[in-house]
Design a protein with these regions (language model features):
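Short, charged, surface-exposed hinge/linker loops at domain edges
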Residues: 2-3, 44-100, 104-105, 109-112
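A generic structural signal for ordered secondary structure
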Residues: 26, 42, 88-91, 123
């Protein structure tokens, strides 16, 4: 089975885009699930068109494949805040970064690598806590 690496990002207009790290495929949508579905539709459309027109396409489209999705920390934070699942207060507690700074990241300020790592570490810790509670 072939594994495809894809990255999920949140655009400035609030939509999401998904793109393959090493391939030409991408998708967009108003939610993460919509963007994933759009990319899969694009992959199938590309294969179908390639067969009809007689040009080459990536061989993995004829095989079983899986897509591993990665989302950057800021896009993940935006997703949960916009969905009303987490608040800035809650994210402050899991990351140790004050709400005012988190708000600025949600609104366009790019965090330094250390701050981005702290956000990622906080979400991983939250994931682990939830995993062990429900495992």
């Amino acid at each position: 089975m072939v594994t495809i690496e894809a990255i999920i990002e949140r655009a400035e207009d609030g939509t999401y885009c998904v793109y393959c790290k090493n391939d030409i495929f991408s998708g967009a949508g108003v939610s993460i699930d919509d963007a994933k579905a759009d990319m899969k539709d694009q992959m199938e459309f590309y294969k179908k068109t390639a067969i009809e027109k007689g040009f080459k396409y990536p061989l993995f489209l004829d095989q079983e494949y899986q897509i591993n999705y990665t989302i950057d920390a800021i896009s993940l934070m935006k997703y949960y805040v916009k969905a009303g699942i987490l608040s800035l207060s809650g994210i402050e507690k899991i990351t140790g970064i004050n709400q005012k700074q988190l708000w600025s990241y949600l609104n366009g300020t790019k965090p330094r690598k250390t701050q981005s790592d702290r956000i990622e570490t906080g979400f991983k810790k939250l994931y682990e806590d939830l995993y062990y509670i429900f495992a």
